[in-house]
Amino acid sequence: MAGGGGRPHDGPARLGTILGKARSGGQTVEEALTRWLVYPGVLRADLLTAAGVLISLGVSLHILMRKRVVGSAIGWTGLVWLSPVFGTALYLTFGLNRVERRARKLKRRPSQQYDETPQAPASVPEAYAPLDRAVRAITNLPTVAGTDITVYRNGDEAYPAMLEAIAGARSSVALSSYIFLDDEIGQTFIAALKQAMDRGCQVRVILDGIGSGYFYPAAWRRLRRLGVPAGLFMHSVLPWRMPFLNLRTHKKLLILDGRVAFTGGVNISDGNRVARKPKFPIRDTHFRIEGPVVEQLTQAFLVDWAFVAGEELEGEAWMPRLSPAGHLTARVVTSGPDADIEKIATVVLQAIACARTSIRLTTPYFLPNDLIVSALCLAAARGIAVDVVIPRRSDHRIVDWATRAHIDPLLENGVRVWLDEPPFDHSKALSIDGEWCFIGSANWDSRSFRLNFELNVEVYDPGLARRLDAFILDKCETPLTRADLDARPHLVRLRDAAVRLLLPYL
């Protein structure tokens, strides 16, 4: 019963009475309706209830049609029915995972991709032909021969090489970074980009709207003041204009003249210059890539720039003819909450399924979904050596807590988990059988596999794979055992288990 002692059937009668008095008393209909709506009776509550039901029903229909993960669909549906307004607001902010972007087809030349050189056939080891075929179906891209890859450790090695490449660019510079700070190294990069533009290069820069600083990142403001074309990915300081708060571009890409590319895990910040002993040093691994596969990297950037700025970049400045630069075979794999959803995760599953002797990976954050956990467990069960290296302490304490509550099935099934001692290592690498490897920006968590826009490169090359193998095995000094997990105090285990429920969004 509502205030004023009204009953449900009193509402229409009360409305009729108010309208009658309005006609006799000279009130307008609007004034009469205002009196009726603010009258402390049941009808007002009924209208609010009906509105809540309609909102919950509409959002529930959207959830049923869009959410493929059953647990996620059940959770969101329950929340919007328990609290229509609050639940709907959260769903619009964090629950919408798909973004419509204009597709841009890869423009391959029909017969020749290299300067006066017939396109070299990309061959892969016979044992990996099924994996090659599967990834081609997933990405709709071919493996490309003629690739050369150089490995850099930390910003100490990567930054000088990147800055030298920017200084040598003659036609175009494309840069995309999740974190781009306006600190000493950030300002050095900004100055280099400005100089490239001043000597006639076309320069385009993408910063993530969350990773580089929410309220108009300082590096973005400095670039704009200097006249350097720079865009923020999925960003607005107005919440109602930014319904995709949870979706970010996590790519790290630098492409010079469409011929030389850098990618991997290194962001642009002073923390990555480990030799200078920053307050929180961040170790990492980055890669310089040359050869025809750079065209696939460039296409990934051009799609993002068209989405951010609405500008289609064309011509030889961005897409020149490319010559072989090495002997590696490679292919780009992009992933994101659009048409590319979960492509990197699917490639990882395919690679695990094709493994014959070893699976070795290092990642700063390890919270994969149950499918990938099960795949690793099954691989270990069939006798494959599976080694997973995670930081003892990452830069996100909550993720560390959730990880401890997530890995027990792996340890139970024979997967070896190792703790990488500080300083924190942000490197991401996967090596299979010492012959195939997967490098790039994606972490092994649900955010990278499903929510973020990511870019990885698969490489068929024993030399690089074994180098990454050695890099990963060198970290395998401190094992994490089930006894270690069981030794945690009960309250700590309870905290970790509770935080794990946030797995889809950590």
Q: What are these language model-derived features?
A:
Residues 417-421:
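Active-site donor-binding acidic/aromatic loop of nucleotide-activated sugar
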Residues 365-386, 391-392, 396:
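Helical hairpin unit composed of two closely spaced alpha helices linked by a short loop
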Residues 348-358, 378-381:
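Long hydrophobic segments that form regular secondary structure
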Residues 10-11:
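Short hydrophobic alpha-helical segments enriched in small aliphatic residues
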Residues 6, 15-346, 350, 354, ...:
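N-terminal localization/anchoring segments of enzymes in phospholipid and broader phosphate metabolism
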